[in-house]
Amino acid sequence: FSSGFSETDTEEGRALERQLIDKLEAANFHLIGPNCMGLYNPSAGIRQNEDQYLGESGPVGFISQSGSVAIGFSMESHYQGIFINKSVSFGYGIVLDSSDFLEYFGRDPGIKAIGMYLEGIKNGGRFMSVLRDVASRKPVVIWRGGRTEAGGRAIASHTGSLASSRNTWDSAIRQCGAIQVSSVEELIDTLKALLFLPPVRGNRVAIAGGPGGQRCERP
């Protein structure tokens, strides 16, 4: 749960983080975090918050850099009939990061769809390689924070991550076959569609709507 490492952008914080990493590497010890809420596994009785559901697990895996987003997603998705299999809040991942959890969830037979909330990635090449592999076998839906200048500054102070440019990120995610969303509501709706509706083949899709402005909001 601790913070106060490199995300503070101070010499003391960076030195403390380096000391922690050195000790972990010497002991061959894997750490989730720091600055996170850890694991949620309803069937194993492990949760991040006392209000989270415990019991039968579902088909969704969720990976989040933000603890509050991880908790909020698990509770709202449960209210809407989407049950979590496993969820992890990993903070700024000084040992295990988004690529590690995505690779693990991709191999988990109990997880049929994966949702992610990311603020930045440390090793872009490895992340894209893992994402391409996992997305070829099961759907991956990604909500990325920090898509504005102010959001990027907030992320740097929150998890110490650097958000890449929007165009670069969008292009890379599209090439890997993942689905992008822009809110937790859209994330849940997309996962519901993927889990409960038959797959759409080809391009025979029509969109009907009321107000013209809302239909023209995005390309």
What are the language-model segments listed below?
Residues 1-219:
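Catalytic-core regions of core metabolic enzymes
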